[in-house]
A protein has these predicted regions:
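Solvent-exposed, non-transmembrane amphipathic alpha-helical segments
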Residues: 167-170, 214, 219, 262, ...
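Extracellular or lumenal secretory-pathway regions
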Residues: 1-115, 229-249, 275-281
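Extended, hydrophilic extramembrane loops/domains of integral membrane proteins
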Residues: 196-243
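Membrane-proximal low-complexity regions enriched in glycine and acidic/polar residues
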Residues: 109-205, 210
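Short conserved micro-motifs at the rims of enzyme active sites and ligand-binding pockets
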Residues: 161-162, 216, 301
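Juxtamembrane interface at the cytosolic side of transmembrane helices
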Residues: 247-302
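Ser/Thr- (and often Asn-) enriched beta-sheet segments in non-cytosolic proteins
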Residues: 10, 34-36, 51, 76, ...
Length: 302
């Protein structure tokens, strides 16, 4: 089987916003954050499917220890080895000492179909736990390889209306005293840079504006505001891996083997029965859509 050595997508934002847990509850955090995805693909059990484990982490500051950990979760599910499409439900571990969730993974995520086409693909959004179309935008070349860029636009969506989970609601202060319920609202966009031949995602831009809104949908408090792109190092490594896919095997079936987890994913052993949780911007993008506080898009104050 083909062994891929690199399976890490690291995105960094020097001025992100999130919520930080403390003994007194939660408090706003503004500063550097790193969002990282690590993918571990197990040895395939048959000729058609493999099991993937995808760990997501959000780290504050330098991300050097568990105290900097903002969020972590791991998804485990079967995929079609050629298309990359989910072939069954996922087990999601996200909170210490709580049962895992069962989630239907729609569409694709980090692996598009081999011989990708200039069309729209449904791509899984882990915050919404459902797919949102990614629209073909352009063909480009990276390190001599043909790469397609697909753009995914996420309209403001009340996540609490989709499923119940920690963090989907909060308490917001009311004018004149008292509190009211706040609802996590997810919005933003992603751009996926996909190696056309193999379907491997070799780069990603992410501009996320998550906030807590009142019953009328007016943004009141930032939850996770982040703008970053895949690090240069990760992108180069992923392009190299794509280039090493045997051409004849891609035409038949992409034989995914074991992909080593990144060091950060190893930290996630404190969560769930799985024993796992779960740079600089090359494609810098504007923050024009950040900080939807007060019901309109306004620049996030720093």
């Amino acid at each position: 089987p083909l062994n891929l050595k690199n399976s890490t997508w690291t995105l960094h934002d020097d001025s992100a916003d999130s919520q930080q847990l403390s003994k007194d509850g939660t408090a706003p955090y503004s500063g550097p954050m790193t969002y990282q995805i690590n993918m571990d693909i197990q040895e395939p059990s048959d000729d058609e499917k493999a099991t993937v484990r995808i760990g997501e982490t959000r780290m504050r500051g330098e991300g050097e220890g568990l105290n900097d950990l903002s969020q972590a979760q791991v998804w485990t599910y079967p995929v079609d080895r050629l298309s990359g499409e989910a072939a069954g439900e996922a087990t999601l571990s996200h909170t210490l000492a709580t049962p895992s969730d069962t989630v239907t993974v729609d569409g694709y995520w980090l692996k598009f179909p081999a011989d990708a086409e200039k069309t729209n693909y449904p791509v899984f959004d882990p915050t919404l736990r459902k797919a949102v179309d990614a629209v073909f935008e352009e063909e480009t070349t990276m390190d001599g390889r043909t790469v397609y860029r697909y753009h995914q636009e996420i309209e403001p969506t009340n996540v609490a209306q989709l499923f119940a989970a920690d963090g989907n609601t909060t308490s917001l202060p009311k004018e004149g005293g008292g509190e009211e319920q706040g609802y996590l609202t997810h919005s933003g966009s992603r751009d996926f840079y996909v190696d056309q031949q193999t379907g491997l995602v070799v780069g990603m831009d992410m501009d996320i504006d998550d906030y807590y809104a009142d019953r009328e949908g007016v943004g009141r408090e930032r939850a996770f505001v982040f703008n970053g792109s895949t690090s240069e190092e990760d992108q180069q490594a992923l392009l190299k891996e794509a280039a090493e896919f045997p051409r004849d095997r891609v035409a038949e079936i992409v034989r995914w083997g074991a992909i080593g987890l990144g060091a950060l994913l190893a930290l996630l052993g404190i969560i769930g029965a799985l024993g796992l949780f779960g740079g600089k911007n090359k494609h810098a993008r504007s923050r024009h859509n950040r900080g939807r506080i007060g019901g309109s898009a306004v620049p996030a104050s720093r």
